[in-house]
Every structure is written in structure tokens, then in C-alpha cells.
Amino acid sequence: MHRLTLPKSARLLKRKQFVYVQRCGQYCRTDQATLRIVPSRHSNIRKVGVTVSKKFGKAHQRNRFKRIVREAFRHVRPNLPACQVVVSPKGGTLPNFGKLSADLLKHIPEALPLVTSSK
């Protein structure tokens, strides 16, 4: 059984990392969020970053969205291919944890072949 953790090494932390994924990533929309996905150069690295603008809501709503996304990514991380993902909210409603986890598992593997073939 995998130990489900999300260490700092599994998160996008620097602006440069976010900009790279935003510019080079494959764009994928779900009901609850927008994903930007880039294949990772190393086979065992899976990273997530979350961006939420102030238009989404007050600080507690933005923080809640970030927590839900990180938790969903933490649960599906062992089953994902090597990639870097930036997640942004869609609309002003908080996502459903189960649906977001399923969306991550479905859309990330679908988008990765598109990214590698377009380069």
C-alpha cells in the first residue's frame, strides 16, 4: 500500500514552474476546474500547483478549494503518469472531492499523449 503524502517535492512552488506549465501545458476543462498538464522529464515526478484568483471568493473559500485539490491529487498521485499539473477553479462553487479525484484520474492520462504528440 502506498503511503499517501504530498511533500513539498510534489508541489509546484516557484513562479517559474507555474509559468512553464501555463505556457507549455495541454489545456483541459472539467466541470469543476481547469487543468494545465505537462509531461514530466523524470519518470517518477508528479507535481501539482493550484492557482485561485480573488474573483473566486473570500480567502476561506480560496483556501478550501486549494485543500480539496491537494487532497484529491494526494489520493490519485500513485495512479498518475509522470506529469506537472496546474489546477484553477471554474466558476464560483467549491468542487466535490470525489468528482475532482475522478476527473484528475480521467483527464490527465488523456491529455498527456496530446502534449507529447504536439511537440
From Swiss-Prot:
Q: Which domain of life is it from?
A: Bacteria
What protein am I looking at?
Ribonuclease P protein component
Q: Which Gene3D superfamilies match?
A: 3.30.230.10
- Which controlled-vocabulary keywords does the entry list? Endonuclease, Hydrolase, Nuclease, RNA-binding, tRNA processing
Family under the similarity heading: Belongs to the RnpA family.
**Which InterPro entries does its entry note?**
Ribosomal_Su5_D2-typ_SF, Ribsml_uS5_D2-typ_fold_subgr, RNase_P, RNase_P_CS
Pfam families on file: Ribonuclease_P (PF00825)
Question: Key word ATP-binding present in the record?
Answer: no
Give the EC number(s) listed in the UniProt record.
3.1.26.5
HAMAP family, alphabetically?
A: RNase_P (MF_00227)
Gene Ontology CC terms: ribonuclease P complex
Q: Which PROSITE patterns match?
A: RIBONUCLEASE_P (PS00648)
**How does this chain assemble?**
Consists of a catalytic RNA component (M1 or rnpB) and a protein subunit.
Any one GO biological process:
tRNA 5'-leader removal
Q: Name one GO molecular function term.
A: tRNA binding
The catalysed reaction is: Endonucleolytic cleavage of RNA, removing 5'-extranucleotides from tRNA precursor
Query: What function does this protein fulfil?
Result: RNaseP catalyzes the removal of the 5'-leader sequence from pre-tRNA to produce the mature 5'-terminus. It can also cleave other RNA substrates such as 4.5S RNA. The protein component plays an auxiliary but essential role in vivo by binding to the 5'-leader sequence and broadening the substrate specificity of the ribozyme.
